[in-house]
Amino acid sequence: MNHCFTPSMPYRRTPAVQARLDAQRASVVEAALGLLAEQGYAGCTMAAVATRAGIATGSVYRHFPSKAELAVELFRTVVGREVAAVSEAAGHPGHGSAAERVVAVIETFAQRALKSPRLAYALLAEPVDPAVDAERLVFRRAFRDVFAARVAEGVRTGELPPQDPALTASALVGAGAEALVGPLAEGAVGPDTVPALVTFTLRALGVPDADHA
């Protein structure tokens, strides 16, 4: 006897189902971001995220199979926002001097960190999964590139003395992060922190009379 088999068709989500899943995923990320800003990575458990989002814990795992994967998504989301903010603040060549554009980067980063200290500490230094540590390197490179582009433009136009833009940029990123980590962790950022960072930045760039800029 001949049997005729009809191959099964692969399941395809309808646009409506996909839209609901996308909306739920977005709500999970926003809930997790809220917890991250309040309690850091330590308080951003899958169960807590589910409660904040108003869904079952299993639904969170549907979108993010592990806390590490959720943490990486959060890190990328926050970093994307921060890099966009400092890039906008830095402006474009011709909008202010090169030194002013570099200073705008460090000022914007520091001021945003002070407005959300718990989130900034999580971004910069909170002990987390190795996967997030790897993302931190990407984050530092992204900020370095923003700095380096402005430094290179200043060197090219003669506004800044000759220097290695990538090296200067890396030093500024490292110094800025290190200067903020301790105060953010202790909740004791003084009013002179940002002005001191600006002065340091101008000196690092080789700007004459940096103390009076």
Predicted segments, located by residue:
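Short coil/turn segments at alpha/beta junctions that flank glycine-rich nucleotide-binding fingerprints
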Residues: 38-42, 116, 157
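Short linear capping/connector segments at secondary-structure termini
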Residues: 87-90, 123-131
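N-terminal intrinsically disordered/low-complexity leader segments
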Residues: 1-23, 211-213
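Helix-turn-helix
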Residues: 27, 35-69, 73
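Amphipathic alpha-helical packing segments from all-alpha helical-bundle domains
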Residues: 80-84, 111-115, 131-156, 166-170, ...
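Hydrophobic/aromatic-rich alpha-helical bundle segments in the mid-to-C-terminal region
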Residues: 121-125, 155-200, 210-213
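Generic hydrophobic, amphipathic alpha-helix propensity
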Residues: 21-32, 49, 74-78, 82, ...
